[in-house]
């Protein structure tokens, strides 16, 4: 990844066949795996020149440039009935 990939805020993946992602340090000395069965989107983001990369499963995404700003029209919104609940689970494994 390059910082320039984050120029528009983040990188959003959807409709992935894989339900997990592994980040490996260039020298192979460290690895982290994120499993995200219950999520529609997988997002990578960082701050410019920060020493980290965030790997996050999401069920909603930031507005696109052409969004109308109306919540019910927002892509990725999950609506529950009053009093309704939903559980989402993801797992993070430190592999090395």
Q: What kind of region is each of these model predictions?
A:
Residues 78-95:
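Short Pro-Gly-centered flexible turn/kink motifs
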Residues 64-74:
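Short beta-strand and strand-turn-strand segments in soluble, beta-rich domains
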Residues 10, 20, 43, 49-52, ...:
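Residue-level detector of solvent-exposed, low-hydrophobicity positions
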Residues 1, 8, 54, 91-95:
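Short, Lys/Arg-enriched charge-dense amphipathic segments
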Residues 1-37:
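Active-site/ligand-binding surface loops and adjacent short beta/alpha elements
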Residues 7, 17, 38, 46-48, ...:
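Solvent-exposed, flexible loop/coil residues
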